[in-house]
């Protein structure tokens, strides 16, 4: 199967979740030049390239976005973000996860 692009992936979801997905994606890429995006069937996974260790899964829902954030090798945290929710706390969690991966 061909690797789908992010845009192709997003066509399958309600357009109203696109701005939130775009913001989260932009934030993940802003963390470092080594961030790699892996488009899966129902989610977008962000990894650190050299280890290909994921730090966050981002999965669009109907009117929210579900995130699974890697806190440590054994611990993940699930966050459901409403479309109008403030991103600051979630971005901090994602940044911590990114910085924790070695």
Where are these regions (language model features)?
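Charge-dense, helix-prone N-terminal extensions
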Residues: 1-102
């Amino acid at each position: 199967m061909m690797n789908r692009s992010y845009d192709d992936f997003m066509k399958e979801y309600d357009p109203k979740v696109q701005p939130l997905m775009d913001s989260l994606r932009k934030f993940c890429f802003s963390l470092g030049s080594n961030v790699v995006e892996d488009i899966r069937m129902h989610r977008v996974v962000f990894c650190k390239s050299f280890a290909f260790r994921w730090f966050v899964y981002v999965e669009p829902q109907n009117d929210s976005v579900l995130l699974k954030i890697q806190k440590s090798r054994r611990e993940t945290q699930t966050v459901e973000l409403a479309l109008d929710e403030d991103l600051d706390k979630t971005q901090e969690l994602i940044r911590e996860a990114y910085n924790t991966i070695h």
